[in-house]
Amino acid sequence: MDSHDLDLVFSALADPIRRGILVKLSDGEQNVRQITAAFDVSQPAISRHLRTLGKAGLIRKDKRGREQFIRVNADPAEEAAAWVGHYTRFWKHHFDQVEDILAQTRKDTEDDNGP
């Protein structure tokens, strides 16, 4: 996943309504009417949110007759989680090193000051 795609995913996930839509879709695919009924926003607003989620690759749309059914595509979220996980491990390692240095500094200070 390139930087631009990652930006789209994080931007899409930044909105509480879009996160709510993904939670609703975790129960299974739904049509736009069903999704709209679950939120206190207009159908055009839901359509804009769905468009943003679609650009980020977080949902897939299937048109059947006159209805459009939406389902979750977890792949981009998993890739974003892997990115976050990488940097979580990176910073944890560096914070552990700082903690070790501070502990050694405290010990050295105590040794210098005596009992």
Segments from the language model and where they lie:
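C-terminal regulatory/oligomerization modules of transcriptional regulators
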Residues: 1-5, 24-38, 43, 52-55, ...
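Conserved N-terminal beta-strand and adjoining loop/helix that marks the start
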Residues: 7-11
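Short helix-coil-helix linker/hinge
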Residues: 12-17
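Pre-recognition alpha-helix immediately N-terminal to the DNA-recognition helix
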Residues: 19-21
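Residues within the DNA-recognition helix of helix-turn-helix
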Residues: 49
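Short, Lys/Arg-rich nucleic-acid/phosphate-binding segment
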Residues: 63-69
